[in-house]
Amino acid sequence: MAKHITGPEIERLIHLLARIPGLGPRSARRAALHLIKKKEALLEPLGTAIRDAVDKVRICSVCGNIDTTDPCSICTDPRRDNGTIIVVEDISDLWALERAGTLLARYHVLGGRLSPLDGIGPDELNITSLINRVIKDPITEIILAVNATIEGQTTAHYITDQLSNFSIKITRLAHGVPVGGELDYLDDGTLAAALRARTNF
């Protein structure tokens, strides 16, 4: 059995860092060591930022984005097109589309995609709240900006079916988004072109 060579506080820091996507145990140890070496310049400000995030960050009750206000700054931005909602799987997809800066629309974060094998059905996603927005607000277009995976396309078809009784235009991102690709990994130019060339769904 491996012997602990650090105190429990450091072990806990390493353990928690290792739970961050993309960081394994070895990377977490390196990150923890770097943070501790830069205690005043990095560790203490990071601790403060994390405490602030715990205290102040909340999920927007309208679109599902995260912000320090509810509704979020996107939902309250008067420059946005109130008639257009871009539907995304995750907040990281919203951020990617915002970086592209092509379309000032509203968003709706599903919180995932349909995946029966993983136990994720319509009730686990923010689909009902999307339908309620369409009922309540004067929406003219829904842009399905879901990932070009099998699960993403299944989700898009399900949403299209649920909205079939409404007189709204439903489009999806153009096929410039590679099949099997994740929005968060695409460059800004590709995302901008995909938004401009969206097609009926």
Swiss-Prot record:
SUPFAM superfamilies in alphabetical order: Recombination protein RecR (SSF111304)
Family: Belongs to the RecR family.
Keywords from the UniProt entry: DNA damage, DNA recombination, DNA repair, Metal-binding, Zinc, Zinc-finger
Designated gene of the protein: recR
InterPro entries: DNA_Rcmb_RecR, Rcmb_RecR, Rcmb_RecR_Znf, TOPRIM_dom, TOPRIM_RecR
Species whose genome carries this gene: Bartonella bacilliformis (strain ATCC 35685 / KC583 / Herrer 020/F12,63)
SMART domains: TOPRIM
Name the record gives this protein: Recombination protein RecR
Annotated Gene3D superfamilies: 3.30.60.80, 3.40.1360.10, 6.10.250.240, RecR Domain 1
Keyword Zinc-finger in annotation: yes
GO BP: DNA recombination; DNA repair
Domain Toprim: from-to ranges: 83-178
Keyword Zinc-finger: yes
Pfam hit, one: RecR_ZnF
HAMAP family: RecR
Molecular function, one GO term: zinc ion binding
Chain ranges of zinc fingers (C4-type): 60-75
Protein purpose: May play a role in DNA repair. It seems to be involved in an RecBC-independent recombinational process of DNA repair. It may act with RecF and RecO.
